[in-house]
Structures are given as structure tokens and as C-alpha cells.
Amino acid sequence: LQLGFLKLLRGTGLRLEAQKYGYTYVDVAPYEIFSNNVLPFDDIVRIKHAEDVLEKYWNAHRMDATIEYLVTDVFDTPFDFFQGFGTYWEERGWSRIGHQLEDLFMRLLDFLSTLPHVDLGIVKTLMLIDYFKPQSFIPRKTWWTERVAEDQLKALYAAIRQDATVAGEEFAAMNVSEKDLFKHSLIIPSSISYKDLQKERVVKQDGYLFIYFRQGQTPYMVDIKL
């Protein structure tokens, strides 16, 4: 998705009529406008703020499920999300520093935590799914804080060891050894149904998400419960 800004190039009809429509603009390349008689300077600045996060979060496809949920179910319009987040981003000076992948997730969560109408449980689960999807191995950096209680974690792994179909028929067919089970999998708290997410529906459901990382493949994920 490209967010472009009107330019008054030399020799164009619009530039010749700039005064008629109240355009103010940069008189040297790239000739971008500052304002006109219907779009004040402050609105241009707000749109500019949206540009940076649009590129990093939507066009880069780093967290498609999360952003789709936010622009569809949480914010009134996609622009409301990108503009609001973009302004928050700019106010904190993040546009002037570099960002690791993990930083992008934490910065979005930081913004959403300031809003009263956001279900952070759903958002955090979607963010983790987006974060894990391109990974072939368990990530070394654990930027998230949600953990399964130790006794619950032991019980869940014990159930999978006893009957692999607890993690689904597809996982059972992999014949994963106990060593690889512990070496290449994670279990995290979940606030949505992963089964429904695969059908492009976000359905709130408290439980656990099992992730098995496979070299060269997308991780296997499934809802599990005791």
C-alpha cells in the first residue's frame, strides 16, 4: 500500500493555479505541498506520521494477523490506526532511531496499552503468532512476558508425551521424539482460537497454543488444553 503526497511539479497546471486553491509548497524538489484551502498543515503532518508506521508494519508484512485485526475490529478505519500510532511513534522520537524486529512488536504493544478499548490478551496472542510464523527455530529473544505456570506447563507436556494427538493428528504423525519435543517447541498462554484464526476469524478463547518449530518450514501451531 503506497501513501503518496501531492507534489506541485514545475510546469503542471495545478502548480500554475496554486494560488487559486491556496497551495503552499516546497519550491525545490521534491515540491511537496504544505497545505491548501481544504487541507491545513496540521493534517498534512498527521498523514506524514502515518507514512512511517504504514511502511514498517503493513507493507513489510511483519504482523499481518495483528494489523488486520486492529484495522478491522478495533479501530474505526485503517487510517485511524496508522495515524494514531504514527503520531505516538513520532512523539517518542522512534522515527529517528533504528529498530530490531522485536522492538517493532514492543512499540506497537506500548501504543495499544495506552488505549482503553483494546483487548490486549487477543492482541498479544496475535502478535506472538505473527512473530513465530517466519521462525524455523525457537527465538532466542523473548520480548514477551506471558508464560504458562510451571505446574500447568509440566502437565501439558506430560499429556503430549502420553498421547501426541493432544497436539493434533498432524503432530502425532510427525513421530517427534521426546528430546525434540522439548528442544523445538513452546507452549504459551493464548486468548484466541487458533483454529478459527486459520479461517480468518478472531474468536476469543482462553487456553494454550502449542508451537513446534521445524527447520525450513512454517512452525506447526495448534490449540491445546488439559
PLM feature segments, named:
Residues 52-226:
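Radical SAM enzyme core and accessory elements
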Residues 1-81:
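A structural motif corresponding to the C-terminal lobe/cap of the Radical SAM core domain
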